[in-house]
């Protein structure tokens, strides 16, 4: 287990860790403001390690995530790529999903202080967190279909359960950018605050209330009881990872990234009938091929 002084180590990639303070509150800051806090694979890996350490550290009672500057997180840094893709569809594991599961499995309450725009994994990484507080001025997007891929970070598990299937489908299907106070995001944020600079102070206020007044074991067990009534995020993670592996090989993925970097509308070419046997989703004991529709 890391001691509390190790958290501020310069070894973390573009992350700043404050605390834990006397009340047991630790703050993880995405510190890459020059790139709108876009995530790199080393940042994702470091956050998983930090969560593991804080989970085992009794001096940590609550963990707050926020972004440096005016953005919370603009998603994965597409100029650096998505990291190494697994050797096979069955072995590929989405890096955002690994972070989501680390947050889900962390026994300490986690709070997202979404101080600015959050896009892609920048918003899906917050879905497993206990509480999300957003700036009224923040913009939110789940842009995966606009990049030629599918939802990541087990968000196909979390988002419908947080805001309902109808709104989740709308957000995932359009991939558009919405204001934090949009009705489509109703239920996603516990609070929206103004000005944006008050987002972190408000999150720290809530964290302090939890750290000082709530049983840590009680908080963990209560959350565990809630999730035990649902299907596991591991299932969503495996399905997303296998599908992402296939999509990473596609022309649409190449075009989605290229058009984004060139700041133009994408021209997607992939069609359903062109998908091979690799384009298969497994749902329990049911196999659904993307190459053909099942008969009803």
UniProtKB/Swiss-Prot annotation:
Assigned EC number: 4.2.1.17
Entry's Gene Ontology cellular component terms: peroxisome
Stored Pfam families: ECH_1 (PF00378)
Pathway listed: Mycotoxin biosynthesis
Similarity section: Belongs to the enoyl-CoA hydratase/isomerase family.
Functional summary from the UniProt entry: Enoyl-CoA hydratase; part of the gene clusters that mediate the biosynthesis of the host-selective toxins (HSTs) ACT-toxins responsible for brown spot of tangerine disease by the tangerine pathotype which affects tangerines and mandarins. ACT-toxins consist of three moieties, 9,10-epoxy-8-hydroxy-9-methyl-decatrienoic acid (EDA), valine and a polyketide. ACT-toxin I is toxic to both citrus and pear; toxin II the 5''-deoxy derivative of ACT-toxin I, is highly toxic to pear and slightly toxic to citrus.
Protein name as annotated: Enoyl-CoA hydratase ACTT3
Provenance organism: Alternaria alternata
Lineage, broadest ranks: Eukaryota, Fungi, Dikarya, Ascomycota, Pezizomycotina
Gene that encodes it: ACTT3
